[in-house]
Regions:
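Terminal amphipathic alpha-helical/low-complexity segments used for targeting or macromolecular assembly
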Residues: 1-104, 165, 170, 175-177, ...
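Structural signal for interior beta-strand "rungs" in well-ordered beta-sheet cores
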Residues: 40, 100-192, 201-243
Length: 243
């Protein structure tokens, strides 16, 4: 995947100077950049490396004397970090999950799969779950009973979403996230040593054996539109109402 300097500039809404027809396939810091990279030199600390860089093109702050570094073209950014957001999006090849529903996926007959959905191998969609249109589920994803996921979700490999979870549109879950697990609440018939220690700020405690009973998590999890959950994050379900 490659773009010309002019195509990138137009896509990002940035001015450029120099040769707009140079093809670009990646980005790198100036010291590591190759001839088909944009050297990221928006900060003054990186400008010194441009003179020895293989890069022909750089992204620099507006007003930089770029020709003195031997460059053939530049993208000019008035707010460099924001410009990097768009540039990285344009050049990100993503996880390249296959399109369509893998024959190795386990889809319950009572699950609802809307149009243009991709589901990777060894993923499971349980009874009554619904996957919104345009969504992508990577390999080894679990979606529990009755869970509803809105359109255009991107759920990366190894994500676990338990039963009765409701998720809005354009949801992103990074690798290994776990949503809707048990709230892990326990209680003892009498005040526990932990409770007593907390109430007395540690002045009184108890180490005698106690019987612990689980408080089951009867609620679910509700997540709105345009939410992203980070890798290996965990969101547990509520006790009597949704988290």
């Amino acid at each position: 995947m490659s773009y010309t300097v002019e195509e990138i500039a137009n896509g990002l809404g940035l001015p450029f100077e120099g040769a707009g027809d140079i093809k670009i396939s990646g980005v790198a810091e100036p010291a590591e950049a190759d001839v088909d990279h944009i050297a990221l030199a928006m900060k003054p600390d990186f400008l010194a490396d441009l003179g020895n860089s293989k890069a022909r093109v750089a992204m620099v702050a507006a007003g930089t004397d770029w020709q003195s570094f031997g460059l053939q073209a530049v993208l000019l950014a008035s707010r460099p970090r924001f410009a990097l957001s768009g540039l990285s999006a344009a050049l990100d090849q993503g996880a390249e999950y296959p399109t369509g529903i893998s024959q190795l996926a386990d889809i319950h007959p009572e699950a609802e799969i809307d149009g243009d959905v991709s589901i990777g191998p060894f993923s499971v969609v349980a009874r009554g779950a619904r996957i919104g249109s345009g969504s992508v589920l990577g390999p080894q994803v679990y979606v529990g009973c009755g869970t509803v996921i809105g359109p255009d979700a991107l759920i990366h490999a190894g994500v676990r979403i338990a039963h009765n979870v409701t998720i809005g549109a354009r949801f992103v879950a990074q690798i290994g996230a776990a949503i809707g697990g048990d709230g892990f609440s326990f209680v003892t018939p009498e005040p526990s040593g932990v409770e007593v220690a907390r109430q007395t700020l540690g002045k009184v405690g108890s180490d005698h054996e106690q019987v612990w009973a689980r408080i089951h998590s009867l609620g679910g999890v509700t997540i709105g539109d345009d939410v992203e959950i980070g890798a290996n994050s965990s969101i547990d379900r509520g006790t009597v109402r949704d988290t």
